[in-house]
């Protein structure tokens, strides 16, 4: 029996919709990263983008466990010597772009490189309940039903 290797032309990509309301950020990010890479498929091939297109709504209502909301810090560098800025998860979630916490969590679970950047392009995260991808008819996945630990009362 020969080892199967998917070709980019053979891959069919599905659209998946996930509602992040009340879901734990890290647990959601692992499931999304696995879907983006295509590791949930029996035809997974490491060097081919065979994952799904994932839409996440209500990202601002995702939950961090423990004291991570106040204690987890995100760093960014301005490009100038000594100009490292830091913000807590709370500041980001209450700020202008609350979806960035979830984007960063998923981004750090995807391999860095050209294929990883393509796979991250298949992720769309929205802070509210509205999204412009109704025409793609995404399949809704209920992450809370997969495991009781995936959800947390805020």
Curated annotation (Swiss-Prot):
Phylogenetic classification of the source organism: Bacteria, Pseudomonadati, Pseudomonadota, Alphaproteobacteria, Hyphomicrobiales
Full protein name: Large ribosomal subunit protein uL13
Protein family: Belongs to the universal ribosomal protein uL13 family.
Complexes and interactors: Part of the 50S ribosomal subunit.
The keyword Ribonucleoprotein appears for this protein: yes
Keywords: Ribonucleoprotein, Ribosomal protein
GO process annotations (BP): negative regulation of translation; translation
Function: This protein is one of the early assembly proteins of the 50S ribosomal subunit, although it is not seen to bind rRNA by itself. It is important during the early stages of 50S assembly.
SUPFAM superfamilies: Ribosomal protein L13
Gene for this chain: rplM
GO CC annotations on file: cytosolic large ribosomal subunit; ribosome
Keyword Ribosomal protein carried by entry: yes
GO MF annotation terms: mRNA binding; structural constituent of ribosome
One protein family per Pfam: Ribosomal_L13
PANTHER family: LARGE RIBOSOMAL SUBUNIT PROTEIN UL13M, RIBOSOMAL PROTEIN L13
């Amino acid at each position: 029996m020969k080892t199967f290797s998917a070709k980019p032309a053979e891959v069919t990509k599905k659209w998946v919709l996930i509602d992040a309301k009340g879901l734990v950020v890290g647990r959601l990010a692992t499931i999304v990263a696995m879907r983006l890479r295509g590791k949930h498929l029996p035809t997974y091939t490491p060097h081919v983008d065979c994952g799904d297109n994932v839409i996440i709504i209500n990202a601002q209502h995702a939950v961090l466990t423990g004291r991570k909301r106040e204690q987890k810090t995100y760093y960014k560098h301005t490009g100038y010597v000594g100009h490292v800025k830091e913000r807590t998860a709370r500041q980001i979630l209450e700020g202008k772009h609350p979806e960035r916490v979830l984007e960063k969590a998923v981004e750090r679970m995807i391999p860095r490189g050209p294929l990883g950047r393509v796979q991250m392009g298949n992720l769309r995260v929205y802070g509210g309940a509205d999204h412009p991808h109704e025409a793609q008819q995404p399949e809704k996945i209920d992450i809370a039903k997969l495991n009781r630990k995936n959800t947390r009362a805020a």
